[in-house]
């Protein structure tokens, strides 16, 4: 528990202190966000708000994770794990793609950064490397950071993917989650607040896996997860980093996370879901992100096939704005829905454990 508190605290402090420094730096150099011309009229006054605040989030997560391990050395703690480094490596690589996208938007003074091909290639490259490496690094118990079995709250042994299919599966998961969080990041604080809740749920889930790991506590309901405690630290550090950033990103936002932050945070969800064997459960926890990307897909499909739009504007948080909801109303209600989804996800996780042990 001490390690979790250290991870949250260090990440929060780094994020909340680094963000205003970035605001001053980006403002001085004119690194402001461009706004969609077809967006809600209320968003036009946000033009010029500093972007790329995701740098503070990624730095906070790394600081929380590494700081906890450095502090643990004084108490003979274990070093970083393969699972932890791979999840953070994935998030950082995606954050790098987002950083380039943000930088191009700023340099060209328009709301279009990397073209779709370049952005997709960057995401797929990160996903392929992650998918290949995450099945390596077998530990003494014979566990690798991920399993080729499809998973709900643990492996579904009847659905095992061949290595090539598993890599393809990772490509889909990584691309879907990174884009889903990216689409959600359209209102002040919406993505950061929602991510804090989802990763808080992952703190509970992965810590429970750690306390009931088959390696240390074999028996009914135990979990075959390679490095559950390290995943807990990453989730906790993400909670702290998002809260620290949210202090400055809450409406009216002083800075936006940009694609730097949203793609990286999507990578955190993708990485945690794969390494904790909860790929299907993650869809419940991140229901808001799933709904946002689904609204975009439906809008595109409907317009191309019928010439009509399903929503006034997609992602669908803008639909409610154009329907007359205040931005803060949309944000708070979507946060509430995220909290409910996370609560449901934790209940499903715990319920499966109770059913497994026959309680």
Swiss-Prot record:
The chain crosses the membrane at residues 3-23, 55-75, 80-100, 117-137, 156-176, 187-207, 231-251, 255-275, 280-300, 334-354. Pathway: Cell wall biogenesis; peptidoglycan biosynthesis. InterPro entries: Glycosyl_transferase_4 (IPR000715), PNAcMuramoyl-5peptid_Trfase (IPR003524), PNAcMuramoyl-5peptid_Trfase_CS (IPR018480). Its cofactor is Mg(2+). The keyword Metal-binding applies. GO terms for molecular function: metal ion binding; phospho-N-acetylmuramoyl-pentapeptide-transferase activity; UDP-N-acetylmuramoyl-L-alanyl-D-glutamyl-meso-2,6-diaminopimelyl-D-alanyl-D-alanine:undecaprenyl-phosphate transferase activity. The keyword Transferase applies. One of its GO terms (cellular component) is plasma membrane. It is found in: Cell membrane. Signal peptide: none annotated. Keywords: Cell cycle, Cell division, Cell membrane, Cell shape, Cell wall biogenesis/degradation, Magnesium, Membrane, Metal-binding, Peptidoglycan synthesis, Transferase, Transmembrane, Transmembrane helix. It is a multi-pass membrane protein. It holds the Pfam family MraY_sig1. CDD domains: GT_MraY (cd06852). It is an enzyme of class 2 (transferase). PANTHER family: PHOSPHO-N-ACETYLMURAMOYL-PENTAPEPTIDE-TRANSFERASE (PTHR22926), PHOSPHO-N-ACETYLMURAMOYL-PENTAPEPTIDE-TRANSFERASE HOMOLOG (PTHR22926:SF5). Catalyzes the initial step of the lipid cycle reactions in the biosynthesis of the cell wall peptidoglycan: transfers peptidoglycan precursor phospho-MurNAc-pentapeptide from UDP-MurNAc-pentapeptide onto the lipid carrier undecaprenyl phosphate, yielding undecaprenyl-pyrophosphoryl-MurNAc-pentapeptide, known as lipid I. HAMAP family: MraY. This is Phospho-N-acetylmuramoyl-pentapeptide-transferase. The gene is mraY.
């Amino acid at each position: 528990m001490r390690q979790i508190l250290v991870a949250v605290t260090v990440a929060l402090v780094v994020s909340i202190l680094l963000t205003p420094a970035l605001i001053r730096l980006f403002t001085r150099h004119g690194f402001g966000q461009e706004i969609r011309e077809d967006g809600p009229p209320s968003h036009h006054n946000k033009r010029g708000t500093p972007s790329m605040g995701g740098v503070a989030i990624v730095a906070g997560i790394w600081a929380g994770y590494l700081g906890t391990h450095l502090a643990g050395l004084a108490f003979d703690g274990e070093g970083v794990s393969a699972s932890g480094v791979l999840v953070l490596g994935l998030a950082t690589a995606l954050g790098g793609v987002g950083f380039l996208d943000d930088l191009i938007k700023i340099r060209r003074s328009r709301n279009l950064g990397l073209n779709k091909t370049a952005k997709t290639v960057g995401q797929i490259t990160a996903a392929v490397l992650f998918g290949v490496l995450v099945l390596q690094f077998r530990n003494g118990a014979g566990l690798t950071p991920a399993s080729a079995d499809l998973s709900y709250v643990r492996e579904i042994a009847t659905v095992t993917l061949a290595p090539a299919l598993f890599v393809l599966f990772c490509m889909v998961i990584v691309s879907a989650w990174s884009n889903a969080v990216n689409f959600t990041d359209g209102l002040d604080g919406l993505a950061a607040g929602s991510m804090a809740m989802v990763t808080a749920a992952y703190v509970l889930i992965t810590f429970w896996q750690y306390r009931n790991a088959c390696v240390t506590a074999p028996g009914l309901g135990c979990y075959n997860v390679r490095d559950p405690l390290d995943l807990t630290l990453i989730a906790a550090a993400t909670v702290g980093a998002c809260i620290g950033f949210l202090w400055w990103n809450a409406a009216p936002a002083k800075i936006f996370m940009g694609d730097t932050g949203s793609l990286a945070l999507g990578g955190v969800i993708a990485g945690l879901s794969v390494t904790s064997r909860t790929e299907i459960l993650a869809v419940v926890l991140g229901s808001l992100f799933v709904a946002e990307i689904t609204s975009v897909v439906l809008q595109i499909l409907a317009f191309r096939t019928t010439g009509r739009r399903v929503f006034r504007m997609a992602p669908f948080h803008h639909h409610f704005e154009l329907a007359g909801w205040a931005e803060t109303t949309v944000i708070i209600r979507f946060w509430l829905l995220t909290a409910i989804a996370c609560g449901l996800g934790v209940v499903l996780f715990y319920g499966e454990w109770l059913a497994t042990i026959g309680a």
